[in-house]
Amino acid sequence: MPAASRCMALLRALLGALLLPMPGVWCFSELFFVREPQDVTASRKDAVVLDCQARGEAPITVTWLKNGGKVSENERIYTLSNGSLYISEVEGRKGEQSDEGFYQCLALNKYGAILSQKSHLTLATISAFEVQPLSTEVQEGGVARFTCKIAANPPAVVTWEVNRTTLPLSMDRITALPTGVLQIYGVEQKDAGNYRCVATTITSRRKSAEATLNVIPASDLKPFHKPAIIAGPQNVTASLHQTVILECVATGNPKPIISWSRLDHKSIDVFNTRVLGNGNLMISDVKVQHAGVYVCRATIPGTRNFTVAMATLTVLAPPSFVEWPESLTRPRAGTARFACQAEGIPAPKISWLKNGRRIHSNGRIKMYNSKLVINQIIPEDDAIYQCMAENSQGSVLSRARLTVVMSEDRPSAPYNVHAETMSSSAILLAWERPLYNSDKVIAYSVHYMKAEGLNNEEYQVVIGNDTTHYIIDDLEPASNYTFYIVAYMPLGASQMSDHVTQHTLEDVPLRAPEISLTSRSPTDILISWLPIPAKYRRGQVVLYRLSFRLSTDSKIQVLELPGTSDEYLLEGLRPDSVYLVRITAATRIGWGEASLWTSHRTPKATSVKAPKSPELRLEPINCTTITVQWQQDSDDTAAIQGYKLYYKEEGQQENGPILLDASDLEYTVSGLDPRRKYHVRLLAYNNMEEGYQADQTVSTPGCVSVRDRMVPPPPPPHHLYAKANTSSSIYLHWGKPAFTSAQVINYTIRCNPVGLQNASLVLYLQTSETHMLVQGLEPKTMYEFAVRLHVDQLSSPWSPVVYHTTLPEAPSGPPVGVKVTLIEDDTALVSWKPPDGPETVVTRYTILYASRKSWIAGEWQVLHREGAMTMALLENLVAGNVYLVKIAASNEVGEGPFSNVVELAVLPKETSESNQRPKRLDSGDSTAYSDYYHLDQKSMTGIVVGVCIALTCILICILILIYRSKARKTSAPKPVQQSTDQLSHTNISLASANEVEKSIDGIAENAESLLPMIVGNSFIDAKGGSDLIINSYGPVTKANCKKRWLFFQDTKKMKTEEPQRRFVQAVCLYQPGTTVLISEDDSPSSPGQQSNFQVPFSIAADTEHSANSEGSHETGDSGRFSHESNDELHLSSVTSATPCATSHFVSSDLGKNVMNSTISDSKESPLLFATDQPATSPLQIHSAVQN
């Protein structure tokens, strides 16, 4: 670089020599540095040399600056002949002037001056230990870790001693990290002792306190331990080219394997990265691309047992230029624009220097973002300009030269400029024509700007050459302005005229003061106000007028106060009453506009122990944000639980309350509109009552200048897009408005949960990018987002609101109630319940199972099930093995912990065949065998004997009931009526048929029939027999037997028959897949006789079976275990101990047809019943179904 700079300087010198005869062209040699000072760390009394060598056209003068001020040279500090600064003895003791600071050298020649980069001189120091090693006990074979931390400049070198001797680090199991951490893996008895760290710098050496390591003998039994990270990586911020170490120490049995990855799935740089010790990640020569989130993962070999820890690496980078300023040549009265852009982490700040001195934006010279604009160039602007970019990592500078070309035939400057005030906003400016070449003047330009303050904008008005006076209006009242005139001709512009300053007249105030209302007692209101800003005061305020009244009274009371006052106490007021107050200010010209009425309620007379009103202060930060600050009275003894904040725009609805803690003394209100007046009230509260409130008004400033008030705001950002990133963060992206050409300053993001009640939870974030990751959100919560744009002191409206929900949290617990049932010789059913927690979302279950031999080898078989399922089949199990089963729940965010291991014993084939099946094993039955399930032969024998005894007892009870029923029917039958609704709605399941009684007429009207219960006579054959029908009275003759199909009964005819009552008993026999047919017989009976109705059922339940589904490829599992349908389960639960048989039934095949036809027609259709089989043919049944 120095050689290239010399060549460039030589080339420019040659070009300057060639151009020397040409009029109006100057030759010059640019000034540049060959060597610049660098950062230095020195000990006290050391000698230091700060280099500085500049090249350019001689003579060159070098001066030194310290912290922006000139270095005072003496015998100890002076400049060498080559421009370097020499300090013979560095001082820095307390009580003396320290030499520490930032140094810069300034090189100057006749063309200008340049400033070097900053050099930071620091003294070598070392502090006391911030963290010292602690004593610990470690089991033999475990991991021991000691740490110490000390602040030093430069960073201290840390070594370790054991028993006051240097610890040898040649063993692989001992690692000493440069960060001050000592790791000992596979601890042995000989490692026991006293450890301490030693920190050494260039100036001193410090030793820490000793820590004892006790080694406990290891037990013979080494149970399985899940991996655990006992020392994970910490967030690190590093400078460019430094070395970073991310620590990761894990324990477990078997010993876990440590691996590293990046959270963004980018590959880790293998050239600058290596593993230090037993899992620590060391990154050498850190670069910006190394920044990110690093994940340490500790995994038990051969298993899915792992744990992770992560940390963020932030890399800071010094500034570097992306765009450099270029040298310019401009004529007098022209405009020069220098561009400069730099990047770095954090983002660098851009500033401009002219001949080594910082430039402030004012008048003709403006700085827009990182650009420098010089308007109305004058000869004094000919200089060397430098763009300086600096951040916490350093500073860089880039230079450019502005050459001002002067015309030889230009006119002289206008003279005799004078100004006269016309009004509060207008000044008359007059001047004389130039004395030289005035006949060539074609126009004049009038320049004016405010005389007070910095960063004032200069305005320009161009007028013709036919006049020498001009009235400038649109000025602010009671303000000083500076004016000058420039004459123009075809070949260029004249020099500036002399400057003249003039003051505008006063005017009435443009607005009223912002008032604050508080109460010290139930009968007073303290009114205080701030001075009106000079911009709106428009002169000196001489009077204030206070007006107040009760809200229920139209009578107004008025007080006038001197302009020097800033508060007034209203006394003798009514307690617990609302008062309205307003204020007006006046200058010597007259009264301004009064403020709007501000309301305030006086405290209740009983609120003597309520918190006093806080002292409130409001301050606008910008045109959309205000800061609310308050201070509670120190004499207030009332307890304060918190504060309530309310705010509203004048004439709008109030927002709040915003609940704040008792420790809060400041709050920022964002998202306001520019040039609006807002009313804020604040009060303290406790468990008993609310305190006295403080009210105050504030006005937000405008975002545009007076001349730009008609400029419309920019359109809002478009295409706002939200995507959930984690359970606590959402990624936002949006587009810049297509019709906005202005430079975007930043964006404001508004974020809050949907349906938010507390306005203090609204989050406002700032960024200059078109994307942002919003963090710190609640899981599984819907948020609303909006974005607004800020450009050139203008704010856009809020974008349309976008709603998005954060992801749920990963399951925090394992599935519960894990049960295992052996349903076949080689098949087991696993069932479980979802993890505890109402907010837990599960999308998938992972089932791990393995035999003991496979488990020891770390080989698990894996099954996955959807989150809606809570059972699975384990197939192809090997007899004689004990299987271990555990389950974990997971969702799209992550996987939860596994459940406790449940053991399942699969008995040998010969043993399992002698036992009854199925065998049900669950975690709730485990006692001495720790989730081990086993049903031996004796247990199964006992179960079988118990079931047989129960069946025998039930059979005896049924026989007794049948015998007694026969006896009752013979003596005195009782009327029974069956509900037709029950018959129609049971749909084969008639468990409640003996609960309700109805008359036979009711049954006939509903086209349903009840059959007589057939007693258990031995001569009745269920498979077939004669046409003889027998009821409880004996055989029924053909004359008295009339068979009617239920579907074809004539109910009207039945009603007209003689009033007789028939005994009806229903007989049924159910088999899966068949339909019951019942017929009714007419039996002679008295009108008062009725029969009992009983419908016993015996339904054989199907065994459990597996539906076809896609299974796990690892095990060939069918994929799911399906229950019976709901109807079948219902039927199987409604069983009777006594099956009944009769010959009055059709065959199974015929019953199936009738069943299918009847049920498919309608849910309300009754079942088809027939009385006896011989009289009914399949043709008749088929005909009946068709009808």
Swiss-Prot record:
Residues 28-122, 127-214, 227-314, 319-403 form the Ig-like domain. Glycans are attached at residues 82, 163, 235, 305, 465, 480, 622, 725, 746, 758. The keyword Repeat applies. Residues 28-941 are extracellular. Its main location: membrane. Keywords: Developmental protein, Disulfide bond, Glycoprotein, Immunoglobulin domain, Membrane, Repeat, Signal, Transmembrane, Transmembrane helix. Residues 1103-1134, 1154-1187 are annotated as: Disordered. Residues 1103-1130 have a biased composition (Basic and acidic residues). It is a single-pass membrane protein. Disulfide bonds join 52-105, 148-197, 248-296, 340-387. One of its GO terms (biological process) is cell-cell adhesion. May play a role in anteroposterior axis elongation. This is Protogenin. It comes from Gallus gallus (Chicken).
